[in-house]
């Protein structure tokens, strides 16, 4: 039993010893390889034997990891990417057999020559990568460097269809000191941006990611085509603005004598000003085009200002009277006869018209039999017709023996005549005022229809003029399609 235990301990010790020996040998081989490879190596010299090997081919790829932010006001795109750079260094070659079958090594980037590929259109002054990772070198002299980077690149923002806008932002890479005769750029695989590790943004959808070589293959342009997700702006900006546009028409429903017409229009106007300030803070102050949302807010603002002016005119018309204004005949024809039929309004009958109807009803058969005859009146209480005749006769002959009246009675009759004339005049003035009020009501109803048509037409014409209003994008499906496109292009020789 004790012999078996000692045997296991001996075997385990031998295995551990061999592992340590192999590790030491591997470390020795790699250290020896590093010494041999970098003996006489100068990292400042471009890795070409002579000028006949120029230009040096540098292969490049870009992998989009995260779209951090797109600042519309400052016109800057903030991205997290992985760069891939490949080139050949003839000095970095060795035979793996001589170095323990080591086929690749990793070295610090300051030990080898690196192509000075920088982002040309950076927006923060940081041209280089943010983390200097190791360079992977294989035994054939092929160099691979995959540094991560966070870039802020300039991006010209097209705000014409905001918030239904698409943007095309470009990242331009190239050598800072070498010209097109010294370095040529190529793609590692496909002429696309790799989105296999991309994390979807909550604000933007990635539509396409093409790439191209420009300036005699001395630069590479990677394009990121993105489309804004509109749910947030629809709820926060578009729907309230549309509701305010239609709310401004409610002023034509309010009675003019309520005194709230101007209050409502001013309140809506102030709300529109607040939304205009909100849009101006989001978008860049460009003069090349007017944003879609700004156009709609401007239309609503202008309509509201016109509503205020028209409301003032309507209030002025509503409170006109016969002592200050006389209604022209054309106004009476247009606003009291023609337009009521056009806007489907019917004027209620006045008190005098209702009296005329009642008096007409008195002439119907069977109604006149209840009318008292003049002979039914008491001699001292004559009928209205007899009273008129009596008054006239009394004026010419005060000693009429037929109907003798006292002086007080004559004064009372004069007072009644004065009151009657005054009531008739008031009724006539009231009729004139009612005509002006009805004209104001007609203008209210007509402008309600006109402004409703303009608001509906403006809303549909402006908001629906964007080319992608009703298009919904499945971001995951789009990314899968771009990945498949990238893999297909990579497999093409």
From Swiss-Prot:
Residues 318-445 are cytoplasmic. The chain crosses the membrane at residues 233-254, 262-280, 296-317, 446-466. GO terms for cellular component: acetylcholine-gated channel complex; neuron projection; neuronal cell body; plasma membrane; postsynaptic membrane; synapse. The keyword Glycoprotein applies. It is a multi-pass membrane protein. GO terms for biological process: chemical synaptic transmission; locomotion; monoatomic ion transmembrane transport; neuromuscular synaptic transmission; positive regulation of acetylcholine secretion, neurotransmission; positive regulation of locomotion involved in locomotory behavior; regulation of egg-laying behavior; regulation of membrane potential. Belongs to the ligand-gated ion channel (TC 1.A.9) family. Acetylcholine receptor (TC 1.A.9.1) subfamily. Interacts with lev-1. Component of nicotinic acetylcholine receptor composed of 2 non-alpha subunits lev-1 and unc-29, and 3 alpha subunits unc-38, unc-63 and lev-8. Interacts with oig-4. Interacts with crld-1. This is Acetylcholine receptor subunit beta-type unc-29. It comes from Caenorhabditis elegans.
């Amino acid at each position: 039993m004790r012999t078996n235990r000692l045997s296991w301990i001996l075997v385990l010790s031998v295995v551990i010893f061999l592992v340590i020996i192999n590790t030491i040998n591997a470390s020795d081989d790699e250290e020896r390889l590093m010494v041999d490879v970098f003996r006489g190596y100068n990292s400042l010299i471009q890795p070409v034997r002579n000028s006949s090997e120029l230009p040096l081919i540098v292969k490049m790829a870009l992998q989009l990891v995260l779209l951090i932010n797109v600042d519309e006001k400052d016109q800057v795109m903030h991205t997290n990417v992985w760069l891939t750079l490949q080139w050949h260094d003839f000095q970095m070659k060795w035979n793996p057999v001589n170095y323990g079958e080591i086929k690749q090594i990793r070295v610090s980037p300051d030990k080898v020559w690196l192509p000075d590929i920088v982002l040309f259109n950076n927006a923060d002054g940081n041209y280089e990568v943010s983390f200097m990772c190791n360079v992977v070198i294989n035994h054939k002299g092929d160099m691979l460097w995959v540094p991560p980077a966070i870039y802020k690149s300039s991006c010209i923002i097209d705000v014409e269809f905001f918030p239904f806008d698409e943007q095309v932002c470009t990242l331009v890479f190239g050598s800072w000191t070498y010209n097109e005769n010294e370095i040529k750029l190529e793609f590692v695989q496909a002429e696309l941006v790799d989105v296999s590790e991309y994390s979807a943004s909550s604000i933007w959808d990635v539509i396409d990611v093409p790439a191209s070589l420009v300036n005699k293959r001395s630069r590479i342009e990677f394009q990121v085509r993105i489309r804004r997700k509109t749910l947030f702006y629809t709820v926060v900006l578009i729907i309230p603005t549309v509701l305010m546009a239609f709310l401004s028409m409610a002023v034509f429903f309010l009675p003019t004598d309520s005194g709230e017409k101007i209050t409502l229009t001013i309140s809506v106007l102030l709300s529109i000003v607040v939304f205009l300030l909100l849009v101006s803070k989001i978008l860049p102050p460009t003069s090349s085009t007017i944003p879609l949302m700004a156009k709609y807010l401007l239309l609503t603002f202008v309509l509201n200002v016109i509503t205020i002016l028209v409301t003032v005119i309507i209030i002025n018309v509503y409170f006109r009277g016969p002592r200050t204004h006389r209604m022209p005949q054309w106004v009476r024809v247009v606003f009291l006869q023609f337009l009521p039929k056009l806007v489907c309004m019917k004027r209620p009958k006045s008190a005098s018209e209702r009296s005329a109807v009642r008096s007409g009803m008195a002439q119907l058969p069977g109604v006149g039999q209840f009318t008292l005859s003049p002979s039914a009146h008491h001699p001292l209480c004559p009928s209205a017709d007899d009273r008129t005749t009596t008054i006239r006769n009394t004026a010419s002959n005060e000693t009429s023996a037929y109907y003798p009246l006292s002086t007080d009675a004559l004064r009372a009759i004069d007072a009644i005549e004065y009151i009657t004339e005054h009531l008739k005049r008031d009724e006539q003035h009231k009729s004139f005022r009612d005509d002006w009020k009805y004209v104001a009501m007609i203008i209210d109803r007509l402008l309600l229809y006109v402004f409703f048509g303009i608001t509906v037409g403006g809303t549909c014409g402006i908001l629906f003029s964007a080319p992608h209003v009703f298009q919904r994008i499945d971001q995951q499906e789009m990314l899968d399609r771009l990945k498949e496109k990238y893999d297909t292009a990579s497999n093409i020789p």
